[in-house]
Amino acid sequence: MGFTSVEPPDFFDWTARAIFLLSTLRSRRNAKQIERENALLDQIKELLSIAIIQCHERNIPSIDLPPSFFNYVCEQLPRHPFAKIASSYIDTHTLFFQISISSFLCRFSNCSEDEIRLFKQHQSLDSFLLSLFDLLCSHHFSVEFTSISLIIKSSQWLFYTLSDYAHESLTGVEADITTKFLSTLADTWPEFEEQCTLSKHLFLLGDFSLISYVKVLCGVFNIPNYNAFILSVEDLLPENISFAAVADFQLSKYRAINDNSVLRSDDFSSKAVFDKYVERECYYSENAISKIFQNYPDLAVLFEELQYAEGNNDLLSAILNTNKYTLRPDDCAPYFYRLMDLCLRYCYSQSNEIGTNVLWSMTTSFINIWRIHPGTCCCVVLSIYWPYLEDKLLKFSDLGDIFEYFFSLIHDCDYAIWSVHDEHQFSELLAFYHRRALNDLVEELGSCPRSSDSCRAILDILNNYIFSCPLFLVTPEELEEQYTDFFKKLKEKYGEFFQNLLKKELTGKPESDLEGLRLVGVQLQATYENLKSNFSARIFNQLSVHSFFAEATCHLFLEKLPTITKTYVYSNCKEIPDHILEMINALYQQTRALVACTGYLSSDYPKIYEAFSGTFVYRNLSLIIDKGLANVLQTVLRESFIPKRSRFYSDSTKMILAPLQDCYDFLQKIDWPSSKDANRFYLHLGKLSENYIHYYVDSMYALFIYSTDIPLKAEPLVPDLPVKQLKEKASHFKRHSGDPNFLKLYRESFTLINTVSLVSGWLKMLHQRIDYKILTEKVMHFKDMEVPSATVIISIKMAHLLVTPKAPYSFSVLLQDPESEFCVHTRDVYDELVPNWKETYQMEITNVKRFKLIIYQRNIHTGLETVYGHATLEVDPDKLKQGHGKDVWLDITNKGQILIGLRVLLKRETPNYYCFAQMEYLTVTEVKMLNVLMISLSKFIRNSLRNSGLMDFVRYLDGDENDNAEAETKEKMDELQARCEKEQQSLLAELDDFFYWIYVNLLPKPLFYLLSRLWFGLLETFRDILVPPVTDSTLRRIPLNKRELKMVYSWLQLFYDFFRNFQDIAPFDFLNTDEYKSVMAIKDYYFVKSKDVKRVSS
């Protein structure tokens, strides 16, 4: 084979060395070894780069190998004496020849220097190295040629075969270069065979070593577990790897003894520690081998015969002769499944972990070494975890790392090259895990977790891996069915959650169940808030977990509510203990809080009203008032006119008004679902209290009138007032008073007046207890409630228009509502100065209205009508609620003004309405009673004035014009003076006694009213005595003389001095009024005409 060559003599040495170094890469055991591999790859690239440069310097021409060359190689390779290559091998490894020979020797032989410098990073170099590595580490070579020496020898035969064919089939320079290259490579092959350390050792199954994975597994945990793992090695032995296990343990022992194991002496702190490691490694290997031989007796016999056969102790020969115990390439997937399953079981049994890192390491090794498709590996891994999920040994939320690691293997894998079997199996696995995820999600969400970590992990797996995978092939109908079932199961889970709360909190006793149901509501609200914070985003873009929880549990809670409260709803609240009412109130408040926070539908509020407001509130308010009405009359008849009058309006009034107090107390204990309901309850109480107060006060008013013998003139008393009993009480009082003096009777009736005043004060105090914060809680609702329905009366009165005097125009106004069909037109009015219509229209409104006014002018001569101007009228009934009416001038598009009158008749019912109406009624009643008393006192005083002769000073002339009046004699005046002084003393004594009782017993406000009105009446009486009224009568008054004037003013001074004693209780001066000053001024201007009367000398 001597041929001329132009390439450097060391070119083929470098090439052969690179190939041998590539074979050493097949032993990868740990991270330190991987670092060595990386360094070795760099060394190989450097050697090949040098060879390329040398080729460039020697001007080696390009080589273009014909296709027949590759066909010959493919035909000769299966005829190798040691080869048992499957037919698929020929097609699979054709790429090796294309890249390794054609690309390496030909494509870059004539590169430029710049191209040479870039060659180290060129992808072709990496392709070449990987192709060589593929061939030498393929299943076929690693299994069929089970030692490196056989690989080397087979490679030498292959190179010789290719060289001979190149010499025969090629011509010219191409034949010389190719033949020289292959021949040199074959000749130098044995030299490198001696330098390859792996040729002296067993190399099992192309870089797959059982003991390696044993160490990986045990390295995850700790050294003691390694011992336990080895002692149970029989659990790790699949059906076809027994001989491989023996060989690998022998290899492990051999390397440990020769300091060539995974861990070298420099990896330990001292030589003694390393020796212990070697001793332990040898012990475990021998122990493991013995256990294998126990399980496989025929294998033990075979090894024993081969080991001690005379002249044949070569273990490699024994392996070749026992090829039936080695693993076939087609069995790699079952072996992978078995090993992964054993690994997972071991990890789970030791620490309940799923061994993610270990399984990831083993899977990547199978993909890289055994060339198993990533999809197949992922199918195997997911299949292994299936039974663990089915048996509930694992939770779906624990598989996050598994999906992340293994889906990264197929992330860059083209799904188009997947096998049909893998696609179908992977799709089924994804469908299973999807169903499993939904089931676990139901369990997690149904338990109302405090943390969302588990649920979030499940959702991340679904979103990131399952939904996004193209092989997740589920029809829309199946998905709809699964998610319908998901929501149904979740609702059932929440129902179970609620039922468990009921079992925990409810005991079956009505009283304790009130508190128990409240606690259930508290827990539901807390769980809702927790779910709301943990699951703020919507799941599957359609489910808000907290809303779904509220929908499922609030419905059950509201259904349970009436069954718990029915024991008390139909009972009189007076018969319910206070602590029970407080519990009902607490339950109601919690119910409202739960409904408010969950945003539950208002359509379910009737369930709350059924348990509370609808029956409970209204019925108990009515019961309280009805019970109070039954006691009003008896209290009035029993407590009136008793010696201790002050106790009546303090104790008795409290007793009578206690039902109203109870009603407000009851409403204070009830919380409100909305402002509208609060108004509704207070309005109901307002109507009840109105009837109650009218009955009470009208009873006192009637008793007051009957006791003073003043006829009751068609007073609006309540229909059910017991008049007969009140008259009997008044008659009984008059018969037993012992003194027919009506002043004594009146002073006994002060307590009735005081009571009316006191009732007014109590109502003010009770009205202040209305929870206005509740009424204004929801502003819009409250405003809607407050907007009245009103009847508006619009009067179109007059207008100031800018027209010339005596213009021939008549004017009319069109009033219309643009939002409705309301439209009215006034009559035509012709006025030289100002048109006056004075027309009134009426309509119903419920909110702000804007009316449009159009003023028309019509020529009275021609009949032509045109628009004079426009104006806009805004009517807001809410702003009219105070004044109830006003007049407004509206501008007419800068051409004058029009006067519009507005009045509104409000139809409003509010809590304030009833309170103010009752206050007004009480004030009117009190004033009527005081007026009765004032009129009676005025009559009593006028009788005294009449008895004193003061009324005789009112004298009139006869009908003729003659002055025939006779002067009073001095004796008669002295007698009149004496009688007047006596009557003054008598009246003063009576007033002192009577007004003492007034001062002591009558409340300050009614006392002041009585004094001021009485004083005003007295002033009018004295004015009548002093000055005649202005009338058209022909009768003429005779003026008073000086003595008469003095007597009149002495009476006035007496009353002034007497009433001045009460000035300290008056809020302002009621004596020195304008009326008093005008009466005092009469004496200064007193005169009569001389022609009418004869002046009387003093």
UniProtKB/Swiss-Prot annotation:
Keywords: Cytoplasm, Cytoskeleton, Nucleus, Transducer. Residues 567-700 form the MHD1 domain. It comes from the Eukaryota. It is found in: Cytoplasm; Nucleus; Cytoplasm, Cytoskeleton, Microtubule organizing center, Spindle pole body. SUPFAM superfamilies: C2 domain (Calcium/lipid-binding domain, CaLB). Residues 981-1097 form the MHD2 domain. The keyword Nucleus applies. The keyword Nucleus applies. GO terms for biological process: adenylate cyclase-activating glucose-activated G protein-coupled receptor signaling pathway; negative regulation of induction of conjugation with cellular fusion. One of its GO terms (cellular component) is cell division site. Involved in the glucose/cAMP-signaling pathway. Required for maintaining basal cAMP levels and for producing a glucose-triggered cAMP response. Interacts with cyr1. This is Adenylate cyclase activation protein git1.
